[in-house]
């Protein structure tokens, strides 16, 4: 398992939004590049970078910052937020990203997705942004039925997804263990867990689920790391323990 720090960018700043709503910005930091370097220095093995301005407003003014982060760190960077067509995904891949996170594009027809995944499957990871049995798209401003997405993922033979609990994201309310266990029980995907991870206790709970299933690839943490609610070294020790 890995711990991946999350860096969300809105109007060139690092932000944290409660449940993805821009009117609920909780934290702001001026320099995303410095934060990315900081996490690499702390020992992060990868970074999770989301362009919230592109996801929510459809504005791509953070491209230069994203490219600079990729240039200035030596660890893998996954990017997401507004990657809703093949051209934009290819552009990010050409920057040298580890992988592109997609969700809204999964609404497109199966032929389009088959072509995309056959060409870039190792460079794409679907994000299942979960809210009460539905999946958030378009910056979590719209929702679609999970079944519609699942059928396509199965046909595309997707094996790994990010599972984000929207109701917990940015809230520091802790993880919903039952949501995670239910999702794992009903589906065959390996998952990365995001949304609501707020304490060392949450890390321990996730590690215990991993011991039961061995299907959790890692955790993606934003606000709790930024606010110091989770100590990086302690969390790493728990994740890496046998």
Curated annotation (Swiss-Prot):
Top-level taxonomic group: Bacteria
Entry keyword Isomerase: yes
Catalytic activity: 1-(5-phospho-beta-D-ribosyl)-5-[(5-phospho-beta-D-ribosylamino)methylideneamino]imidazole-4-carboxamide = 5-[(5-phospho-1-deoxy-D-ribulos-1-ylimino)methylamino]-1-(5-phospho-beta-D-ribosyl)imidazole-4-carboxamide
Gene Ontology MF term list: 1-(5-phosphoribosyl)-5-[(5-phosphoribosylamino)methylideneamino]imidazole-4-carboxamide isomerase activity
Compartment(s) where it occurs, according to its Swiss-Prot or TrEMBL record: Cytoplasm
Active site: residue positions: 8, 129
Keywords, alphabetical: Amino-acid biosynthesis, Cytoplasm, Histidine biosynthesis, Isomerase
Entry's EC annotation: 5.3.1.16
Record flagged with keyword Zinc: no
Chief place where the protein resides: cytoplasm
Gene3D superfamilies: Aldolase class I (3.20.20.70)
Pathway where it operates: Amino-acid biosynthesis; L-histidine biosynthesis; L-histidine from 5-phospho-alpha-D-ribose 1-diphosphate: step 4/9
This protein's GO CC annotations: cytoplasm
Any one GO BP annotation for this protein: L-histidine biosynthetic process
Group of enzyme by EC: isomerase
One Pfam family of this chain: His_biosynth
HAMAP family: HisA
Family: Belongs to the HisA/HisF family.
Protein name per its UniProtKB record: 1-(5-phosphoribosyl)-5-[(5-phosphoribosylamino)methylideneamino] imidazole-4-carboxamide isomerase
Species the sequence originates in: Dictyoglomus turgidum (strain DSM 6724 / Z-1310)
């Amino acid at each position: 398992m890995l711990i991946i720090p999350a860096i969300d960018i809105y109007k060139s700043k690092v932000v944290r939004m409660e449940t993805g709503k821009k009117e609920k910005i909780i934290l702001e930091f001026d320099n995303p590049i410095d934060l990315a370097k900081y996490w690499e220095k702390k020992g992060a093995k990868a970074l999770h970078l989301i362009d919230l301005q592109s996801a929510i407003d459809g504005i791509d003014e953070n491209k230069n910052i994203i490219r600079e982060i990729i240039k200035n760190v030596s660890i893998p960077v996954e990017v997401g937020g507004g990657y809703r067509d093949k051209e934009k995904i290819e552009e990010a891949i050409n920057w040298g990203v580890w992988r592109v996170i997609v969700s809204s594009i999964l609404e497109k027809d199966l032929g389009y997705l088959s072509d995309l995944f056959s060409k870039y499957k190792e460079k794409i990871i679907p994000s299942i942004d979960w809210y009460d049995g539905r999946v958030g798209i378009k910056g979590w401003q719209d929702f679609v039925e999970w079944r519609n997405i699942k059928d396509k993922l199965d046909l595309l033979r997707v094996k790994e997804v990010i599972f984000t609990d929207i109701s917990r994201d940015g809230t520091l309310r802790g993880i919903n263990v039952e949501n995670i266990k239910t999702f794992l029980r009903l589906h065959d995907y390996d998952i990365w867990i995001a949304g609501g991870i707020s304490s060392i206790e949450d890390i321990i709970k996730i590690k215990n689920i991993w011991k039961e299933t061995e299907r959790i690839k890692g955790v993606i943490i934003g606000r709790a790391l930024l606010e110091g609610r989770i100590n990086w070294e302690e969390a790493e020790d728990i994740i890496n323990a046998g």
